[in-house]
């Protein structure tokens, strides 16, 4: 659940921060993906690509930590 505090009735700032948080958590992507039926074969390929991307990112982070 995403929580966004609204300070001094500043709703525009709250909406902007909500959009940023939703983008960070990939809410928009998951909403877009669930609009249409996705066959199991396509879903499997997409999940594998996402997993590879995540692992590459983790390896890059580890390398950066080792260099420092």
Curated annotation (Swiss-Prot):
A GO molecular-function annotation:
structural constituent of ribosome
- GO BP term, example: translation
**What keywords does the record list, in alphabetical order?**
Ribonucleoprotein, Ribosomal protein
Bias (Basic residues) ranges: 54-68
Give the span(s) annotated as Disordered: 39-68
Work out whether the entry's keyword set contains Heme: no
Q: Which family does it belong to?
A: Belongs to the bacterial ribosomal protein bS21 family.
Name the chain's protein. Answer: Small ribosomal subunit protein bS21
């Amino acid at each position: 659940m995403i929580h966004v505090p609204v300070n001094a009735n500043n709703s525009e700032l709250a909406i902007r921060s909500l959009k940023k948080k939703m983008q960070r958590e990939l809410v928009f992507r998951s909403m877009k993906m669930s609009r249409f039926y996705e066959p199991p074969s396509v879903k499997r390929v997409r999940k594998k690509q996402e997993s590879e991307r995540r692992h590459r990112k983790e390896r890059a982070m580890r390398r950066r930590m080792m260099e420092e």
